Amino acid sequence: MNRIDLPPPAAGGVVLSWPGKAPPTFPPPKAPRLVETFEPQRLVTLQSAPPANRLYYGDNLDALVHLLDAGYAGRFRLIYADPPYDSGVEWTRKARLRTTLPRELNGVVIEQPQYSDVWSPGAYLQFIYTRLPLLRELLAEDGSLWLHCDHRRVHHLRCLLDEVFGAENYLNTITWRSQTARGAKVNAFFFPHSAHAILVYARNRAAPTRWRPQRRRIELSENEAAGLFMRDERGFFRTSDPGTYSFERLKQLHAQGRLYAPYGGEVIVDEAQRRVYASKGGNLGVKYYLTSLGDGRYQVERGVDNIWDDIPGLGTTPGEDLGYPTQKTEALLERILNAGSDAGDWVLDPFCGSGTTPAVAQKLGRRWVACDASYGAVQTTVRRLQAVCQQCSVSASDSRGDAEGRLCASPEGFAVYAFDEMRPPQESVGKIDLAITRIEGQEATIEVAVLDADIPFARSLAAVHPALDWRAAVDSIAIDPAYDGLVFRAAMADAPLHKRATVSGRYYVRAPAAPTTLAVRIVDIAGGESMTTVRIEA
């Protein structure tokens, strides 16, 4: 597959041109190699086939071509694409020690390069233009594409989408308030840029496109509610026209105290005429009461339009901050996935960055594919997904799972693939001291204790903060209880998401009967990876 035919331009339509514009062409399919998996079910049984959810490390052009070649055409109900914005910035991830030290003593240890958003004239538009036809082919007939961008290129990207998807398949533009201007930005020249745009297109609007209206909950004080709603002895309420309600249904609503008569009138039920009406004229209304939250607070539900100012950006959601630039909040992706997909649907994110889309898809029961060309992004996504998978696998009565040494059933995990020409950075040179103990009476259970990790960042840490141990320099620990020497198949991971939380260092995992090779991999805060293996004979 070298080319994909685009729809013919509409009569009188607008076609965007730029220096070096060329028809989209694609490389031949390449076979990615399986790099690692996270399979919590391996705590119970070994699986031969890797999980269906997959993360690709490499150029997403190769990944998209591979997906089409592998039979994924028309499979994805929803595609969320958050490409570079042509911002002119070399983006980095800021890494800090995992410690409760005061912030002034715990500055940024390293800035890890993530991706370049600097483009030559015409290169940015050609980059996007080449990938859009592939996304269209992967999208289900009733699916939707959500392309996230900002003020710099939104006008150009809409023209490209019209050209590739057809202007008739344009659905809407979502305006998301991504930040609240503070400090000097408040007085920015011709107003601050506080919003992003999300362009929404259908594969075939006539299909029709999968769509589920969204609602949002709004909290009001008693004074706010009094200014917006009517009130009776039961509380604040709004009214709605009863429409075609039957006589019996109106009688039922009246018995429940849910009919409203205007002008101070009363509700009259005329059995002989089989009608319900207001004594002083006017139209009856059906009462819908606000939910009382106590303490003088009330909650009301309202429909969501295309102005999303109720979902905060990362700046006001610090608990989600992974230190990754351009990270999006989970609430944003929850709304998008809930609006355009159902549980069990396939979701694709070709620019996954910090992994918000696959993390939310995992929580919502969607199947997913994600891609990124930055190894730092892949590491961040893997760590995030490991934590999500283990959280999903633990019952409410055992909510902390393996970090406390408890075994639990798990959902499907995920697999990581890489294209041959894009290999991870060389593993950092380090020594991991382990203590392995089989639990008496539970021969299949192994206690793994990480006693020390002599990794480069831990050595640097000891020189600056002697009181801190190696855990402050570690982002995650993963364990493969049956390592085959080829693919690291983690059965459990300790991947704390809170920026100051540290790994436990003591774990219980199930392992197959001896002999087996147990592998432990540590990823430090700078992205360095160290692994050690232990052969268990009995």
At which residue positions do the language-model features occur?
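Mobile active-site "lid"/loop adjacent to the S-adenosyl-L-methionine
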Residues: 84-127, 142
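Glycine-rich adenosyl-nucleotide cofactor-binding module
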Residues: 54-55, 314-346, 352
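Conserved proline-anchored active-site loop of SAM-dependent methyltransferases
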Residues: 74-93, 161, 347-361, 370-371, ...
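Short glycine-dipeptide loop
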Residues: 134, 139-145, 343-344, 364
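Accessory, often C-terminal, charged low-complexity segments
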Residues: 1-37, 41-48, 52, 69-73, ...
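A generic alpha-to-beta junction signature in SAM-dependent methyltransferases
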Residues: 71-72, 132, 138-140, 165, ...
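Conserved acidic E/D residue at the C-terminus of a beta-strand in Rossmann-like folds
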Residues: 59, 371-373
